[in-house]
């Protein structure tokens, strides 16, 4: 049974879903005002791995991830570029999905846009006002955090301690520094929608609570995002649901942040943000997935030229093993090693212990190579297929095997036969033919190995 860490509880517990065999995930998605960076990539990979493993385990996954297509940052970027906010949102959303595709992330089953749920947001805000949990001011409608007795549950802090340490925008119109905007009254030249409080637009925290409840229903299974969203965003979502008397997420999951060299936090203000497009120019996109797998999802991850290079080298071992399986050809065993699979699943079920699971698979790669070298092809194939199946379950596919055409592999087999018959002139000619086609040839104890 899969156990996952629950942020609200502070420890791991068994995953029990609302409906047996089915799970609803709401993952806070992108605010589309700039190019996606490696921080976005990290959280996308974390939840892609979660979804894939759930599906591998037999679950039907309802994966909802929103697009915030109206926000202060989008408006700010539009003003900078002298464009309309919707132009900015459309442009950067397209970049987002292109980057996610390159990373190999599965598209969510539903992608709600904030601007498509304005009517529902107005209804929720009006209900909160009617309940006395929200109040109108000259610049908008605010939620009163004092309306929720356990405000601070996700942050594991009391309301008093949150108030004393509050780092929020100063606004003398609010009753408390922690009160947050549900509806923002329109400023000149800003997009707006009609409401009982005049023209305006929803606050960020209102958007996600409305979309998650609308698409997954009350008491949905899991709400996820980065650790930077625990407070205030997710705390504020939860507070609205509590005030409305609506069961909200049954479990909260948060991933660690990306760090630059030396543990320095990655941020735009420090000028150390690496966009995903820059990353893809520097490295195989699969290397970032492997790097993410080698780090526990709740731990910070350091992304440097060195860590990416190490991941590329490790990928080379996976690709080479896949190539050896293709070169072996005609091996009867079509199944993966069950011990490898069972050990992999056991580690993954322990709060997605991807570092432990990955270590098991790379040890299996080592053992498979030993078996290939010893000409134990069936055992080597069984281990290799186990490795490929398990890595495939978390979205990491080997390259190499499928890229070498059968005709080229046949040249290698002919070369092996020539060498066995001590026809070295023919073997050398076949080697030259393979090299001329753009492939490298290695002589191993198990025969000719061909690589790109």
Q: Where on the chain are the PLM-derived regions?
A:
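Short phosphate-binding/catalytic loops that engage adenosine nucleotides
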Residues: 59, 133, 439
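Anion (oxyanion) recognition and catalysis
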Residues: 55, 129, 435
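N-terminal, positively charged nucleic-acid-binding surface of large information/translation enzymes
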Residues: 9, 18-104, 450
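Short Gly/Ser/Thr- and Asp/Glu-enriched loop/turn motifs at secondary-structure junctions
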Residues: 107, 137-138, 443-447
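Alpha-helical recognition segments enriched in aromatics with Gly/Pro capping
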Residues: 1-33, 48, 97-98, 119-326
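Phosphate-binding beta-loop-alpha motif at adenosine-nucleotide cofactor sites
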Residues: 109-116
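Structural preference for alpha-helix termini/caps and helix-kink/transition segments
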Residues: 264-267, 272-452
